[in-house]
């Protein structure tokens, strides 16, 4: 606002601090030579020049009137701010190139690689995406629930795929755009467990898009069909587990199985809510403070009956559909 530079003088240093923080983060993750860093430096210089210009104009107005030289100073500051704005326009384009979307695939077993391989191949072809294939350790579970022998199968994955070492990757620094997991059990598998660091509840701290894709397919299950009663009962072991609730998105093999998942979850939640008053401390954190209706609405939005890569080119529910679904999650959904 002409004649009142005080608000701008307060805001400009804050904008500069934000730009410096962003530049530092880019340097740490991508290196100092990135064009986005140099654009941010020019942006900061333009803000600083505008700040000095406004400050000089403000101090030069001793009479309290808007003198001609002060108006000239304000026009100069406006030009400098326009220059800063142009830097931001350039920055948006360059950031899309310098800072690729990063997707981390977590697998504990090499034999499950086939369930995700087409997705990895499709994303590796994109120039705007950085793919990390990260085998993670898993443990046998003793009868008392404690973890015993550790297994790591990183050496068993196909050699043509670069492996990211889970011991050197810094999730907190990287904050990947998407994490794809295929083990939803967390601590609730009685036979084995991935390293607790990779439990779904913890992974949610590091990404806004946690995706669960089962490593297996099953026969279609109809909850209302008496012949499927046992199969529907057994769904409790892989559906009503923490990863399904913590994941932002779950991709299952068909619309029919999506309906079965939702029915199983609905019955599970009804039972959980009945026990809420008796055992409130035992409830999962992701289930607390929400009604059954709220949770079911959430699950309906999160579970997609798209297909499975294990079904190959099966029309309507094969690799193509799964690849397109993951691309939509990664590039279109907020």
Question: Residue spans of the language-model regions?
Answer:
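Active-site and donor-binding regions of nucleotide-sugar-utilizing enzymes
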Residues: 101-299, 303-305
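N-terminal pre-catalytic "stem/leader" segment of glycosyltransferase-like enzymes
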Residues: 1-178, 183, 187, 316-330
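Structured N-terminal alpha/beta-domain signature
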Residues: 297, 306-321
């Amino acid at each position: 606002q002409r004649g009142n530079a005080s608000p701008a003088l307060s805001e400009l240093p804050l904008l500069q601090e934000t730009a410096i923080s962003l530049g530092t983060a880019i340097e740490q993750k991508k290196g100092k030579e990135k064009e986005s860093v140099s654009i941010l430096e020019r942006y900061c210089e333009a803000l600083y020049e505008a700040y000095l210009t406004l400050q000089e104009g403000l101090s030069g107005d001793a009479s309290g009137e808007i003198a001609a030289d002060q108006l000239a100073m304000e026009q100069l500051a406006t030009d400098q701010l326009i220059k800063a704005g142009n830097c931001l326009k350039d920055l948006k384009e360059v950031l899309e190139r310098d800072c690729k979307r990063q997707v981390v695939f977590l697998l504990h077993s090499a034999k499950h690689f086939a369930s995700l391989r087409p997705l990895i191949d499709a994303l590796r072809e994109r120039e705007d995406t950085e793919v990390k294939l990260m085998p993670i350790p898993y443990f046998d579970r003793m009868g008392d629930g404690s973890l015993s022998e550790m297994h790591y199968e990183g050496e068993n994955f196909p050699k043509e795929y670069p492996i990211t070492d889970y011991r050197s990757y810094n999730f907190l620094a990287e904050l990947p755009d998407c994490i794809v997991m295929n083990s939803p059990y967390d601590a609730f598998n009685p036979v084995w467990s991935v390293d607790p660091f990779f439990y779904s509840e913890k992974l949610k701290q590091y990404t806004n898009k946690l995706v669960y894709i089962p490593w297996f397919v099953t026969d279609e299950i109809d909850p209302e069909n008496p012949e499927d009663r046992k199969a529907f009962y057994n769904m409790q072991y892989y559906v009503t587990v923490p990863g399904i609730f913590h994941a932002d998105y779950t991709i299952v093999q068909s619309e029919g199985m999506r309906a079965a998942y939702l029915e199983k979850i609905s019955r599970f939640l009804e039972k959980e809510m009945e026990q809420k008053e008796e055992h409130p401390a035992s409830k999962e954190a992701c289930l607390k403070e929400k009604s059954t209706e709220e949770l079911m609405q959430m699950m309906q939005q999160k579970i997609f009956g798209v297909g499975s890569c294990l079904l190959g080119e099966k029309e309507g529910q094969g690799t193509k559909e799964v690849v397109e679904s993951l691309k939509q999650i990664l590039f279109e959904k907020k």
